[in-house]
């Protein structure tokens, strides 16, 4: 049976946002096995890679904290996935997939360019179609046995401008989208600070203006905008956009962008 380091496994299962956090958490005795409560405190210890881990004493609502991003989006944009066929683009461990299932999705296509990341409980769920090593940039309608009416996007190291054209091909007319906008992967290199962090509110505003305009060009109306409740890698502020595939697409959030950025910076000013 294949084995993996405890800290790497804890990170892959979504217990921590970064490998470094996972390492520290293991050393602090925070990581235990779901099955028998066995505690692991040596980050480099190798254990079977199908060992389900959790944080000591904590009941996670979703398989990863990332699920809280989509949870917020469904609430603030008043969206429902009840009975829907959906796509989770950039599924990773499956936080967004878990949210969709817990909110009544009938079928979820969990798409990721990587492999062996989706949480075990989701792999076993008959409502989940795991599509690993799948580059969504080249997706076609025929790749999906049912037409999705809802999609979420949480991708890294790639611009949304490379994802939305493919999604437009695949998604049903009037289909809804929650897209995580990550300025660190949308801004020009000269706008990104040390360690890949963007702290300048003006850069955030510029990115949101250009991304929302691009979405309209690709056939998606932009109907809602807010900030993500969780910061991205290295503490980057990220944003949630609500899009809808429409024949006559429009940008309805343009006047709100500056205020959304201001709220985000107030929320995370001490972090």
Regions found by a protein language model. Name each.
Residues 94-95, 116:
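Glycine-rich SAM-binding Motif I of class I
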